[in-house]
Amino acid sequence: MYDILDLYEEPYDPKRPIVNVDEKPKQLLGDKRKSIPMRPGCSEKYDYEYIRKGTANIFVAVEIKAGKRFTQVTKRRTMKDFAVFIQKLVDEEYPDAEVIRIIADNLNTHKIKSFYKTFSEDEANRILSKIEFHYTPKHSSWLNAAEIEINIMDVECIGRRIGDIETLSDRNLFTHPIYAVR
C-alpha cells in the first residue's frame, strides 16, 4: 500500500508518468421497444424489458497528474487484450517516456507473462523495458484511481443501455474532463 501512496506523493514528471490501469465488463443491452424521447420537464422513458446482446470490456488508463484518460473497448478481457492495450500506451501515448509506472490490481491478465504470450520475446522485452508495474494490495482497489474514473464514467456516460460495441467504442461517450492534480 505504501508503495502506491509514495508514487502518488511524487511530483509530476512527464518522463516517468504514473498511469493507473483497470478494466470493466459492460453488458450490451438493446431496447425491446423504442424509448419515449425526453421533452421539457420529462426525462427519457425506457421500457423495463430489454434484449441481451452480449458483453464487452472497457480498458481505462488514467494519468491523474497530467489530466489524461485513455480508453479502449474490446470484445473480451484476455491477456492478449491487456498486452495490446499497454503496447498502445507505450507506443502511441507515451513514446518519449523513460519509464511508465503502471498501477494495477493483481488480476491474472496484468502480469508480465501476458506480454510473452502475446508478442515475440524481443517485442515483449521492448515493451517491458519501458514499464514498471506497481500492484495494489488485495482488498485495496480503492487505491487505484482508474477504479474511481470507471465509476465516474459509469455514472455519467455508460450507466445506461448500450446495445452494441460500436456505440460503446464511440469516443464521445468518454468526454468527462479529467482535472490535473499536481
Q: Positions of the model-derived regions?
A:
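Short, conserved catalytic or adaptor-binding loops enriched in Gly and charged residues
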Residues: 122-128
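Short catalytic/ligand-binding loop motif for oxyanion handling, primarily in non-cytosolic enzymes
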Residues: 27-29, 109-112, 142-145
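Extended, low-complexity cationic-aromatic segments
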Residues: 1-87
